[in-house]
């Protein structure tokens, strides 16, 4: 007579978890007889979670089962156990300097899991750096492609984002205050009409026949624009 065939059922326990469904490499094993060789179980997998074993009871009590012994000669039902959601780091490369550091908003996450925001979208807010326009977060150091404004929690991988900046240019306006004809004051051509936060800008005094010129701002004599200055 033929040996009795016993059933094998697999419960992945993934109905309440976020993200893609779990994968069971043992799914083809649906039954056995006492004449079959023992079956060594393979771990299931699920993005965002660590597999912690197959159990022979729904309460996940006792030790995990690693092999089905065919001499047990009974129907089997195995249950997958999963870890808490794995935490993935989010790293921000600010591409700034010690003299003028950038800041990342506190609202930008430093870690996330597949269940963050209910498994939905994680938003990246702009960084700030004095004297620069923020052009976006990029997922590569070469700034190839477009900037990234958000990513799905279901990516379940470590993230690194690179800040891209464009230095701001500020206007310089000169008011020469009076004179006419040969006595018209002159602003030396070497004086720039724009400047940036990086590097001091020396200012050559205005020239007027018979006068000594100085530049004044808010009642103070100005001989240069100091490094670190901003604004028109």
Regions found by a protein language model. Give the residues of each.
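Secondary-structure capping and domain/repeat boundary segments
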Residues: 1-232
